[in-house]
């Protein structure tokens, strides 16, 4: 019996274990950290052996294949040992893809992934399609394939997931943008990171579709190095040669495979970056053949995504916005660009090799104060203090919200859009956003 060992006992690892067992493999799950109770129960219910707080070498190194959770870097000592002995290492998505014939709509990019993925899922669901949501959001693809299979899956893919995918194929691949992010995981080399994103094209044929942002210079450069076999569907802000999704005279326009228009003002998502997300999602729906009235309705009633430019409430006529999902400079830039009132910006967390220079002119133009929130804020002081804005240094969310409350004047906006990962002070970016919302609502 072939032995599969799964490194990481979270959503993706536990789901992969259930599918592997269903397909007749000898399965073992190992996690260096603690495994959460719901995942322990899932593994126990299926009589799958697991360990936490350690990696037992003799139980791992004898695997025929390893399924690695995306959060584990290739530099991890156990992963290095496995690579040295030549054991194949794949992702949960790669594994799940072997056991389903469902149509896969896959979304990647540095920013906008979750919003675009959620919007496509919303459109497909509204159209009555049998669809699952998976990857970085939703439930484990492997668990859905094992226990509640669907005809379509809408999958958000990070570069980490794409790294360990080899035979998997997207029927519809979407590449939103490529800007520096996670460089700490790619030897601080932007080329390596960009290359990982382009893996979304692998194994595609003429029968498949590739949707991408035509105005992104990095995508344009990368595409020159890659043979694209799929039908291409570029989108851009304005109508230009070859572009099939754009805005023309304030009309949101899809030109292929069928023509569709609606007023831009009816789109539920606002801001320039969300326009691109809406174009990508509309093209995916159009390719699948969803009726235009459903596309229109879904684009106009989509409620948005938690922790992404989420309006919390107004206190003393100051609007508080939770954009905790902005874990890189580009995401923060887009958030700031969409602000229409003087803004107090909350920055900070675990730095991922950020270059803050592109942000400086916009911060100077839009911001009336800065609040730094992190275990170590020195790099923020070094980059932003010279702008001459009022600055407050905080090391907890309660101190941060208190500082914002004291600084903000009626008519202004407080924006949590930190540019950084959350792991220095919080469990994750959701925890950061939830703490912010709770404290703001208690002001």
Predicted segments with their positions:
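N-terminal leader/targeting and accessory segments in enzymes
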Residues: 1-91, 95, 270, 382, ...
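Phosphate-binding loop of NTP-binding sites
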Residues: 2, 21-22, 58-61, 70-214, ...
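C-terminal helical cap/extension that packs against the catalytic core
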Residues: 39-44, 357-412
């Amino acid at each position: 019996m072939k032995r599969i060992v799964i490194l990481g006992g979270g959503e993706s690892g536990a789901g992969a274990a259930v599918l592997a067992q269903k397909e007749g493999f000898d399965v073992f799950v190992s996690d260096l950290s603690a495994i959460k109770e719901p995942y322990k129960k899932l593994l126990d219910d299926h009589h799958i052996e697991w360990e936490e707080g350690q990696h037992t070498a003799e139980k791992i190194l004898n695997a025929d294949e390893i399924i690695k959770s995306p959060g584990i870097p290739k530099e991890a000592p156990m992963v290095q040992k496995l690579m040295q002995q030549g054991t194949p290492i794949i992702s949960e998505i790669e594994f799940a893809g072997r056991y389903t014939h469902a149509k896969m709509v896959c979304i990647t990019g540095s920013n906008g992934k979750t919003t675009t993925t959620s919007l496509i899922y919303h459109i497909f669901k509204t159209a009555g399609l049998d669809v699952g949501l998976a990857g970085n959001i939703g439930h484990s693809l492997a668990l859905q394939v094992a226990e509640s299979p669907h005809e379509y899956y809408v999958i958000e893919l990070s570069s980490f997931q794409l790294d360990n995918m080899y035979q998997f194929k997207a029927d519809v691949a979407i590449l939103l943008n490529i800007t520096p992010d996670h460089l700490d995981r790619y030897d601080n080399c932007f080329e390596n990171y960009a290359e990982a994103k382009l893996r979304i094209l692998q194994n595609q044929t003429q029968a498949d579709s590739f949707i991408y942002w035509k105005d992104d210079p990095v995508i344009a450069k990368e595409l020159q190095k890659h043979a694209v076999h799929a039908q291409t569907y570029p989108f851009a802000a304005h109508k230009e040669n070859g572009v099939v999704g754009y805005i023309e005279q304030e009309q949101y326009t899809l030109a292929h495979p069928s023509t569709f228009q609606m007023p831009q003002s009816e789109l539920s998502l606002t801001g320039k970056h969300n326009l691109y997300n809406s174009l990508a999602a509309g093209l995916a729906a159009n390719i699948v053949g969803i009726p235009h009235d459903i596309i229109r309705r879904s684009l106009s009633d989509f409620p948005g995504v938690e922790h992404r430019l989420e309006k919390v409430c107004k206190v003393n006529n100051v609007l508080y916005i939770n954009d905790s999902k902005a874990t890189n400079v580009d995401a923060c830039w887009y958030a700031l660009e969409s602000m229409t009132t003087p803004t107090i910006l909350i920055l900070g967390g675990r730095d991922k090799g950020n270059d803050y220079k592109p942000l400086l002119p916009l911060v100077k133009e839009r911001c009336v104060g800065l609040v730094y929130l992190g275990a170590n804020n020195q790099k923020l002081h070094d980059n932003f203090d010279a702008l001459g804005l009022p600055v407050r240094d905080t090391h907890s969310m309660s101190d941060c919200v208190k500082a914002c409350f004291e600084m903000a004047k009626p008519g202004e906006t407080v924006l949590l859009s930190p540019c950084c990962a959350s792991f220095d002070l919080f469990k994750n970016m959701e925890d950061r956003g939830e703490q912010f919302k709770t404290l703001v609502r208690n002001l």
